Design a protein with these regions (language model features):
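Conserved non-catalytic scaffold segment of RNase H-like nuclease domains
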Residues: 2-110
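Conserved protein kinase catalytic core
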Residues: 13-15, 133, 193
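A short, structured active-site edge motif that brings together acidic residues
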Residues: 38-42, 120-137
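Substrate-recognition/cap helix-loop segment adjacent to the acidic, metal-dependent catalytic center
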Residues: 102-126
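Active-site-proximal helix-loop-helix substrate-binding element of RNase H-like nuclease domains
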Residues: 44-62, 130-186
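Acidic, Mg2+-coordinating catalytic module of metal-dependent nucleases/exonucleases
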Residues: 91-101, 105-106, 110-111, 151-206
């Protein structure tokens, strides 16, 4: 089994332009064989726009990681070329994201804004949440009780268990104090862990 798990960080829900795209390619023989984190040069370079981003408080983290070489700031077209090259080279059995509808939309929106026509995810990204964790983890009695016990409930008039990646990871790893970083590569790592656990619970393959 070989999978590609990706995550995007965007300016916001109302402006889902990608400034950070990270992904991991994993197989069940060698583990993680590719890990990449790219900052979109055309977006990140717009200082005023970045200051209004939903996770603008993460900017110092990005500055440090760029300085350390942990991530690279490159043009959007280059990011997608590398992603396509990795897909062609490693031939993953599936491309996944947690709440993939958001990532699909954000990548398409960024392509449209920046005039990039070749989108490696245009055929769709498989959803870890709706496809696997929702039926097999977050609707189980054990998960519901876990969320109730620790206060991981939504703020709806009738609260229900949170289904976001952070809470699912807390449950699976029994780490109630875990806080999602909300940077693309690091979030891809926890999404991979969730995917692998969900696949093991269902006996399914990617």
């Amino acid at each position: 089994m070989r999978v590609l798990v990706l995550d995007t960080e965007t300016l916001g829900v109302c402006d889902p332009t990608v400034y950070d795209l990270g992904y991991i390619i994993y197989d069940d023989v060698d583990g993680i064989i590719v890990a990449r984190d790219y900052i979109t040069k055309e977006v990140y370079g717009q200082t005023e726009r970045m200051q209004t981003a939903y996770y603008a408080n993460k900017l110092p983290i990005y500055e440090q990681r760029l300085a350390d070489g942990y991530c690279k700031q490159v043009k959007w077209a280059y990011i997608l070329r590398v992603l396509q090259r990795d897909i062609n080279k490693y031939k993953p059995d599936g491309i996944y994201a947690y709440n993939s509808r958001f990532d699909t939309r954000s990548i398409a929106k960024t392509c449209a804004e920046l005039g990039v026509n070749k989108n490696p995810t245009a055929d769709g990204i498989l959803d870890i949440w709706k496809g696997l964790t929702d039926p097999h983890i977050t609707q189980t009695e054990d998960y519901i009780n876990f969320c109730k016990a620790h206060g991981f409930m939504t703020k709806h008039k009738k609260p229900r268990p949170q289904a976001k990646a952070e809470t699912v990871y807390r449950y699976l790893m029994n780490q109630t104090d875990y806080v999602e970083e909300h940077t693309a590569l690091e979030d891809s790592k926890i999404e991979l862990a969730i995917l692998l656990k969900a696949l093991s619970l269902t006996g399914a393959r990617a």
